[in-house]
Amino acid sequence: MSFSFGFTSNDFDDDELVVQPDASFEPVQKNGKNDTHPNPLDSGFLLQPNVVQPKVENLETLLQGLKDVRLTFEEFQSPLYKMPLIRRELFDVKHQLMLETDTDSSNNSTELDILLGDTSEDLRKNVYEGGLKSWECSYDLVDLISEKIDKTINNIDAVLEIGCGTALPSEFLFKSALLRDDTSNNLKFILSDYNASVLRLVTIPNLIITWAKTVLTNEEWSALQKGESEDIPVSSEELLLSSNLLTAFYDDVQRRNITIVLISGSWGRKFNNLIHEVLLDSKKVLLLTSETIYQPDNLPVIAETILDIHSSPQTEVQTYVAAKDIYFGVGGSIVEFENYLNKKISSGNLPIRSERFKVNSGLKRSIICIETNQAMY
């Protein structure tokens, strides 16, 4: 693989992560050669009451909850290869949250305060993991994938994005699948985020907007929003999620044989068991994750999550992990992750190889490629 990114710090709003420390965290032990500690995926901490347990969210239920929501979105390009992308505006998400708060007082107040920006935190462990924002390394993945999009989209039957948030890499692949207009896609998107609210507020909305902008004619764009009411305003920068439009989205995705699976909750053994069930019939999987190793506590868990998914004998997996080289003020680093990963591969004599590629950027970022068996492309 060969690529050279030329991003500069001016390409992003490179906010420092502001994290509420969790003094109750139980450090995860690494498995050394003679180490009797359990796999980090089996850590008792991951089962504590304050940790959201993983579950598959019902897509139809999420779509029904978005009925009559008007989305304001931004069309923009990836920094290097100028790949077109779409994301829901953050102020629009906050507007929806405020409207929902006025009508439903049962919302998680702590999570809501962080989502609305009422605290100084970008995230808080086990409460909100930062998924509403689009972080720099997700753009790196988009530009990397774009280099080999034709081979990628034709050689995989599943995309798994862990810690997806706005899911820009998956959105890019989703659009590529839509452009094929092929009813024999047989392509599955598994999108996971700790917060179900993130899946509802940005992950699925971004896919719906991408679908509408990609497949609908101007007439369909207008008609599906207006229905029988000509008084409903239609804009090129907004999308009203009418019942007709949501039904059209759901039906068209099914017609194209594209499956969308949404998983909320924490990583760990229960999460991986769900993933293995969802991937049971998949032969070639592209696993993507960005900005998920920012805390040393998370690092062994995400590494073991990836290694466990690679362990399936009937599935060929290729993984891209995008991250900043060092997360100042938080403690995670790409070097520590790479060292942990390579130590496990070596000590376990695993049929997996990894390689790190530098992103040519003043922000100092990297992408680690992890492959099982032969590379898919």
For the regions a language model picked out, list residue spans one by one:
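S-adenosylmethionine-dependent methyltransferases
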Residues: M1-Y377
